[in-house]
Amino acid sequence: MAKSNKRRPAPEKPVKARKCVFCAKKDQAIDYKDTALLRTYISERGKIRARRVTGNCVQHQRDIAIAVKNAREVALLPFTSSAR
């Protein structure tokens, strides 16, 4: 006997369109010295959050990643967190 393939399709969740914060606010710049801004894009473990999580556009997500890496190099941000 073959199994029947009559599964119900999962209900579709409404997709919320997120706008890039930096595209919306043209005057806000991404700088490696602005650690308060950069900490919002870093997880508790010290990883850079993904674009689908932050809602940034491609260019600004790249700029955030470069700024975080530069801030880590000059010891403004830690490479990893101390929580284990």
Curated annotation (Swiss-Prot):
One GO BP: translation
Superkingdom in the source lineage: Bacteria
A Pfam entry, by short name: Ribosomal_S18
GO molecular function: small ribosomal subunit rRNA binding; structural constituent of ribosome
SUPFAM superfamilies xrefs: Ribosomal protein S18
Function (record text): Binds as a heterodimer with protein bS6 to the central domain of the 16S rRNA, where it helps stabilize the platform of the 30S subunit.
Protein name per the record: Small ribosomal subunit protein bS18A
Species: Mycolicibacterium paratuberculosis (strain ATCC BAA-968 / K-10)
